[in-house]
UniProtKB/Swiss-Prot annotation:
Keywords: Cell inner membrane, Cell membrane, Membrane, Transmembrane, Transmembrane helix, Transport
Topology versus the membrane: Multi-pass membrane protein
Annotated family: Belongs to the binding-protein-dependent transport system permease family. AraH/RbsC subfamily.
Cell compartment(s), UniProt: Cell inner membrane
NCBIfam families for this protein: PRK15432.1
Stored InterPro entries: ABC_transp_permease
One GO MF term attached to the UniProt entry: transmembrane transporter activity
Sequence intervals crossing the membrane: 14-34, 39-59, 70-90, 93-113, 115-135, 157-177, 206-226, 252-272, 284-304
Cellular compartments per GO CC: plasma membrane
Lineage, highest ranks first: Bacteria, Pseudomonadati, Pseudomonadota, Gammaproteobacteria, Enterobacterales
Superkingdom of this protein's organism: Bacteria
Protein name: Autoinducer 2 import system permease protein LsrC
Gene responsible for this protein: lsrC
Organism of origin: Photorhabdus laumondii subsp. laumondii (strain DSM 15139 / CIP 105565 / TT01) (Photorhabdus luminescens subsp. laumondii)
Subunit structure: The complex is composed of two ATP-binding proteins (LsrA), two transmembrane proteins (LsrC and LsrD) and a solute-binding protein (LsrB).
Length: 333
């Protein structure tokens, strides 16, 4: 039973989502509907993108706490580019390039200079956030064009163009991680770094790619943020990194690396966003969001640690069970 839960964390996250849907449907009978699912999915798109990027980094046994600042900085660059007269496609390209460079910088510091990931990204968190405020002079960016806002406008099945693009990205990343040698390299790097090197995996390159893709996902999150609300506050992205990590852990991504799937992380992001919608339904203040996200993260970490200890204990018992049986039989004879 313990192994079943450990090996199927996506199913447990899905069950949690369905249970929460059931609970909220008791309060409001119209809550459990296709419209609600699409609305929650639309609200979850930013967190899903950040969780997808965080998945790659965490699989390699690293962590990035600067993604919220990267998303905010990229949103600012997006807004400034559009207001400067650049086309939407050029502005998006510049934004994605900036996100990739920011992620690459994090990865280079971690792999080439051997600075611990948590220390590196704590430093760049302040660096990117400060650069964002310097560029805007602490002001909001407003007056964004309608063509940007149309990216998040409902389309077929009440899902926006960005929503459909996101689903394609989810399927592509899930397939790459599960079915390709390149994808399995992320698991090998996080599970056993030295062993992966002996098998020919270019672990430094894999880690840099993980951070770079993480930066691109953060840039996409910044674009989605700008398109959804139509302006860019000076605190855009603040606190999102903790929610992204919480979503990954909730979905079964191990902080020790080498374990988990991107589908699990996405379900975790959906669940956390669903909690937010539940708070709106219950008419609770918005500042409960961070408290609940922190509580869920702590609870999942405790559960994950206890589950891991229980599984290891069970494996040890099975390993030495036959020796104990032999000792007992010798004592009887």
């Amino acid at each position: 039973m313990l192994k079943l839960i450990q090996n199927n964390r996506e199913i447990t996250a899905l069950i949690a989502i369905l249970c929460l849907f059931g609970l909220l449907s008791v309060i409001d009978h119209q809550y459990f509907s296709l419209q609600t699912v699409t609305l929650v999915f639309s609200s979850a798109q930013i967190l899903i993108l950040l969780a997808m990027g965080a998945t790659l980094v965490m699989l390699t046994r690293n962590i990035d706490v600067s993604v919220g600042s990267i998303a905010g900085l990229c949103a600012v660059i997006m807004g400034m580019s559009l207001n400067a007269g650049f086309s939407l496609s050029v502005s998006c390209l510049l934004t994605l390039l900036l996100g990739m460079c920011a992620g690459f910088f994090n990865g280079a510091l971690v792999t080439w200079l051997k600075i611990p990931a948590i220390v590196t990204t704590l430093g760049t968190l302040g660096l990117y956030r400060g650069l964002m405020l310097l560029l805007t002079d602490g002001k909001w960016i407003e007056g964004l064009p309608d063509e940007l806002k149309r990216l998040s406008a409902p389309l077929w099945l009440n899902i926006s163009p960005i929503g459909w693009l996101l689903m394609i990205l989810i399927l592509a990343m899930a397939w790459i991680l599960a079915k390709t040698p390149f994808g399995r390299s992320f698991y090998a790097t996080g599970d056993n770094l030295q062993g992966a090197r002996q098998l020919g995996v270019r672990t430094d390159s894999i880690q840099i790619i993980a951070f770079s893709v993480n930066g691109v996902m953060a840039a996409l999150a910044g674009i989605v943020f700008a398109s959804q609300i139509g302006f860019i506050p000076n605190q855009t992205g603040s606190g999102l990194e903790m929610r992204a990590i919480a979503a990954c852990v909730l979905g079964g991504i191990s902080l020790l690396g080498g374990t988990g799937t991107v589908i699990g992380a996405i379900l975790g992001a959906f669940f956390l966003t669903q909690i937010n919608s539940g708070l709106v339904l219950l008419k609770l203040p918005a500042w409960w969001n961070d408290f609940i996200a922190g509580f869920v993260l702590l609870a999942v970490l405790i559960f994950d640690g206890r589950l891991r200890c229980a599984i290891e204990k069970n494996i040890r018992q099975q390993k030495y069970a036959r020796f104990l049986k032999n000792d007992k039989s010798n004592q009887v004879t």
